[in-house]
Regions:
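Non-catalytic DNA-recognition/assembly elements of restriction-modification systems
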Residues: 94-180
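Polybasic, glycine- and aromatic-enriched phosphate-binding surface used to engage nucleic acids
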Residues: 1-107, 111, 173-180
Length: 180
């Protein structure tokens, strides 16, 4: 009990707050339940930890665009979504972000956190229950999605999974063609 860190999955060693991304999440969720943790939190081997000094990782991973990518190309555990740092995260075709994009994404992500903070009694699972999301949290995610869709090249907020997939694969084709 004096040294609980000795039993943790080695990986992220940090003395600053970090973002936790679940390895497996329900396929029924509209958003990936991503969370910020303090350095003294020990995450299990079922959570990916990532440093996120400016809130960009949180915002991107919390968007509809990202979970659409994850649902489309990511792995599965039974029928649930399975996050992978290599396929899901590293393959995500995020364009180069301007300073303005970064600031807007960070602010939109902060709005999501503030909406969650209105109900501190709720767990992440309760916040993201498919039929039980608080309207304020839904609105915050809508704002994040509007920003993320614009960054990905949408002329307006995407309304369907198919619209997002078309953008994602166009961006992916563009990025992989440029690297040759």
């Amino acid at each position: 009990a004096r040294f609980p860190h000795l039993f943790r999955q080695r990986g992220l060693v940090s003395n600053v707050p970090f973002v936790g991304i679940p390895e497996v999440s329900s396929e029924a969720r509209a958003y990936l339940p991503v969370a910020h943790f303090e350095p003294d939190v020990i995450i299990s081997n079922k959570v990916y930890g990532a440093l996120d000094p400016d809130g960009i990782v949180f915002a991107v991973a919390s968007s509809s665009m990202f979970i659409t990518w994850m649902k489309t190309v990511g792995g599965r555990m039974k029928s649930d979504l399975s996050f992978s740092s290599t396929i899901t995260w590293n393959g995500f075709p995020l364009p180069a972000l301007t300073d303005k994009d970064r600031a807007s994404l960070a602010k939109a992500g902060q709005n999501v956190l503030e909406a969650r903070a209105l109900h501190p009694e709720r767990s992440l699972a309760q916040h993201y229950a498919p039929l039980g999301m608080d309207p304020t949290l839904v609105k915050a995610h809508d704002g994040l999605d509007t920003m993320m869709d614009k960054i990905m090249g949408a002329p307006r907020r995407c309304r369907t999974k198919l619209e997002r997939q078309e953008l994602l694969f166009a961006r992916y084709a563009e990025m992989t063609t440029q690297s040759r």
